[in-house]
Amino acid sequence: MSMQDPISDMLTRIRNGQAASKVSVKMPSSKQKVAIAAVLKAEGYVTEFVVAGDTKPELEVTLKYFEGKKVIDTIKRVSRPGLRIYKGANDLPKVMAGLGIAIISTSHGVMTDRAARKASIGGEIICYVS
């Protein structure tokens, strides 16, 4: 049986890994998953990510903790295969009044809501992280 929503699977693995206090989580890799992991690393939500393997590349995300507590409080999928959510540059949401981020897939790549607002481009809202 094939996976219906690989991005939701990635977010769930990260959420479950942090709940179980794992050091890292592994998952099948794709270009979009790597782009999301890069945004999470740039924003300080994960320590590192590595893509390994030739025939079946695997993405390993090293989770981040601060004083024994998980850094990612909530990570929630917004746009899903059954209901895509697109917003223009002026309608992009602010997560927790700017304390969290929304990860947006735009025509210029995957970026945060702040970067998309600054570049005046909208796109598909992938998830909220806080």
Curated annotation (Swiss-Prot):
<keyword id="KW-0699">rRNA-binding</keyword>
<dbReference type="GO" id="GO:0005840">
    <property type="term" value="C:ribosome"/>
</dbReference>
<protein>
    <recommendedName>
        <fullName>Small ribosomal subunit protein uS8</fullName>
    </recommendedName>
</protein>
<dbReference type="InterPro" id="IPR047863">
    <property type="entry name" value="Ribosomal_uS8_CS"/>
</dbReference>
<dbReference type="GO" id="GO:0006412">
    <property type="term" value="P:translation"/>
</dbReference>
<dbReference type="InterPro" id="IPR000630">
    <property type="entry name" value="Ribosomal_uS8"/>
</dbReference>
<dbReference type="InterPro" id="IPR035987">
    <property type="entry name" value="Ribosomal_uS8_sf"/>
</dbReference>
<dbReference type="Pfam" id="PF00410">
    <property type="entry name" value="Ribosomal_S8"/>
</dbReference>
<comment type="subunit">
    <text>Part of the 30S ribosomal subunit. Contacts proteins S5 and S12.</text>
</comment>
<comment type="similarity">
    <text>Belongs to the universal ribosomal protein uS8 family.</text>
</comment>
<dbReference type="GO" id="GO:1990904">
    <property type="term" value="C:ribonucleoprotein complex"/>
</dbReference>
<keyword id="KW-0689">Ribosomal protein</keyword>
<dbReference type="GO" id="GO:0003735">
    <property type="term" value="F:structural constituent of ribosome"/>
</dbReference>
<keyword id="KW-0687">Ribonucleoprotein</keyword>
<dbReference type="GO" id="GO:0019843">
    <property type="term" value="F:rRNA binding"/>
</dbReference>
<comment type="function">
    <text>One of the primary rRNA binding proteins, it binds directly to 16S rRNA central domain where it helps coordinate assembly of the platform of the 30S subunit.</text>
</comment>
<keyword id="KW-0694">RNA-binding</keyword>
